[in-house]
């Protein structure tokens, strides 16, 4: 049927000409009456086809009443049968999308759930979202994220079945944050599109159309990604709210270099270097001079600064000053001023009890700050002045040990005083700790289980392919690594006595990835606690941990 014919039929409908059915569309607020054509209704909608061609109505019936969720939206749906545009309805977009699905489901029509993906439903209308989930299915990927991201913390879960609660619970907890990169407009830095994957199956939990940088942390208390972003000639901290896909900037966060989140999720710590000017030595080689270096401690709940701690003098006083071959610092008339390089931090770690902040600088100078007393507990230099190994792998901080992995050396420090307990001369690409005695040393195609106290290799486990970027989840003893095909591969360790290990690919093309323990933790705890009250066994409790990502 041509557009002109449909337009004429709708004109007849408005004028009440040559119509054979009066349809009354009723909701809780109004009744809309339309003069329509049975053949148009039956040909466009299975509900009306059954109504008119079944035994539900007398053949002489000229008026039918239907009760719907929203009469105005239903009128628009019927207008679409005639090829007409929608009337403008004074309700929010999210409400129109949800109620249109309800109305289309009532009429037996197909609906497009992709419109659900980015809507933001107010907490007082969460029941409406749950009702729509019952129509499209709780496992529909376009609504599942909304159910967990937008759930009010005080929501009555008795409105949701236990099976659906268990399904939603599986969408929280252990996750892989997979990053796919692209060059920024001016190619000054690289940004990534975030995709959240289930750590066991690799199934996509959530995607976002926003871009973040590699330097980020996940705020599990507020379900936000906090990252270092770039604006003109400065760097700053931005937050991406995963529930609404919206961004905002943290005030007083400029010239930021590093960020880390406390294990309890309450404090965000950032490190800032303010550059004063660029100076030149007698050979006209430039040197960026740092004006000040400081840590800022933010309250995660309101993003306000709790206190700041300046460390420029501490670094200048305790770090080794060295010559860099032909470009000698002594050749500069400003040799008493250290370049920005001396103040750059490679790793920032917080102890499990959130009491200590330990940092490793580019010069392999280490500093431990007591967060409670706001005092420097200890400083140390890992290498002598002439050591030129600048290839950093990763660091680990436990309650008793601080471990730093360089390309050809692993340092084990006593976290209470900074004393070096062990220097392990091994070429490696990273190290993870099983406990205070045993560590996992990572090589390109093998893993060495090593007892560092007794200087003994317990087991060497060979891999079938080269292992690239990697993170380790100590709670489940699972290692995640990327391979040559940009896929994430997981390795499950049963014990130390195995000769080989099996792998299972989490199929996803990625440039970078990070393991996250407590994705959407508040909702995770709420769902888990509810299931426990229903006499169900829950195994979803998570223990947070922090491991620096390997470059």
Curated annotation (Swiss-Prot):
Q: Which domain of life is it from?
A: Viruses
Known InterPro entries for this protein? BTB/POZ_dom (IPR000210), Quinoprotein_ADH-like_sf (IPR011047), SKP1/BTB/POZ_sf (IPR011333), WD40/YVTN_repeat-like_dom_sf (IPR015943)
Report the residue ranges that make up the BTB domain in this protein. 19-90
Q: What parts of the sequence cross the membrane?
A: none
CDD domains assigned to the protein according to its UniProt record, in alphabetical order = BTB_POZ_ZBTB_KLHL-like (cd18186)
Family named by the database record: Belongs to the mimivirus BTB/WD family.
What's the name of the protein? Putative BTB/POZ domain-containing protein L76
Q: Which organism is it from?
A: Acanthamoeba polyphaga mimivirus
Q: What is the lineage of its organism?
A: Viruses, Varidnaviria, Bamfordvirae, Nucleocytoviricota, Megaviricetes
